[in-house]
Amino acid sequence: MKKLLTLLLISGIVPFATAQNEADKWFFGTGAALDFSSGSPVVISSPMNTSEGTAAVSDATGKLRFFTNGVDVYDSTKTIMPNGTGLMGDVSTTQSALIVPNPAASSQYYIFTAGADGAGDFRYSIVNMTLNGGLGDVVLASKNTLLTDS
């Protein structure tokens, strides 16, 4: 009886579950990008030129928020954000940037950057999505904050 009740409960909830689409857009290479929001990859344009190590984030509906190569940060209109140049990641580092939502502030994201291979520095910058008319801004006071240095 317990198994039947569990099955009925799950089958009643599943149709109401919604997908998380925060990773629908991928930006990489020389002007290359893909949009997976339709279920199949669709080529879209990108102003970014990089050899490796990019990161992008969309909202839960799949709408692009911003993307970066670890050096420049682009908003959803594919324009560099205010204070969005000069991050200290390295475009030839395999994973030069990682975007993580700030658990304490839903309108903010951390961009973690890694410098050139062997340099050993690991930094973060904060993007505040309430600034610049909702397109986001790299918060100058947090830009390139050093976490580790070897």
List PLM regions with ranges:
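Beta-propeller domains
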Residues: 20-94, 101-104, 114-140
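Surface loop/turn signatures of beta-propeller and other carbohydrate-active proteins
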Residues: 84-85, 142-150
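Hydrophobic beta-strand positions that form the internal "hydrophobic ladder"
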Residues: 109-111
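Intrinsically disordered, low-complexity boundary segments flanking structured domains
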Residues: 11-15, 99, 131
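Bacterial Sec-dependent N-terminal signal peptides
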Residues: 1-24
